[in-house]
Amino acid sequence: MSKIRGLPPEVREPGPGVELGVENGLLCQLIHSPEFNLFSNSVVFESNFIQTHVPEADFQVTKPGNWRDVCEGSATVILGVTSSVPSLPLPNVLLMANVTWPQGPFTTWSTPGDAPVINLSRLLPLKYVELRIYDRLQRILRVRTVTEKIYYLKLHEKHPEIVFQFWVRLVKILQKGLSITTKDPRIKFTHCLVPKMPTNSTETTPENSLLSSPQPSEPLVLLAAEQTSGSFSQLSGKPQLTADRNNDTAIEIDNCSSYKIPSPVASPINLNIPMRAALSHSLWEQEDWNEHLLQVHIASYLGEHFLGA
């Protein structure tokens, strides 16, 4: 029984990233392999580093320029970043792997015994990692995790200087942001690492109406408060009583009939809570304007009856 084989993979010329050793490297092949199958549609930016240490010290560095390799022999550390979703404009995942090269770094192998051994040691969200440039001259990065674990990683000497400049640019991008556009516009998504600036749009949708609904301004709120306080001040004076009890009753009925409860719909205050308030405050912290106005009108109506009695 013959097996149907698929088409051979497309042969492409290696890009400049592959030649520099920052794309399609061992870390990318590891997480895209069937064993892990992680972020298969995302690009991985990676480089080889040497973890540094200072002799006769508990810390990895004490004085500038006094470094020692932590890993013995030809062991190296691969540091890389990628995106959990290909459409994200910035990477959001940090990867670290320990590599042992039997024949030395960047060497080719023809037999499985000469292949490098790679173990994925860290897979962390970038928002829980602090990445800094510690020493530009010696090309050293400082990586601090949320558990206060600090790594001092020196870029391998096999990498040219341009590779470290890529890491310098990456650190600046992660700190300040780069773009609000996506990598692939065909992929639809509802979240973005970089906040999108508001744009003037004439189209109104249910979501846009919530986002564009203005928040009640302070002058309008003060005006409503003055009108409410004025109605309370009018209720403080009792109607003059006459000798005839029937006339008193008629006066009170006329006062009640002349007072009308304003409709909340006719109020100039916009009662829609904007989406910004919903994002910055929890539901129980938001003030319900409908309930507030209704309580004021009921209190005014009851106060008029009690004060006029």
From Swiss-Prot:
Record InterPro entries: GARIL-like_Rab2B-bd (IPR022168)
Signal peptide positions (record): none
Transmembrane segments: none
Chief location bin: Golgi
Keyword Translocase (UniProt): no
GO CC field: Golgi apparatus
Residues the record lists as Phosphoserine modifications: 231, 263, 267
Keyword Aminoacyl-tRNA synthetase listed: no
Keyword annotations of the record: Golgi apparatus, Phosphoprotein
GO biological process, one term: acrosome assembly
UniProt subcellular location: Golgi apparatus
Family the UniProt entry places it in: Belongs to the GARIN family.
Role noted for this protein: RAB2B effector protein required for accurate acrosome formation and normal male fertility.
Subunit structure: Interacts (via N-terminus) with RAB2B (in GTP-bound form).
Protein name: Golgi-associated RAB2 interactor protein 1A
Organism taxonomic ancestry: Eukaryota, Metazoa, Chordata, Craniata, Vertebrata
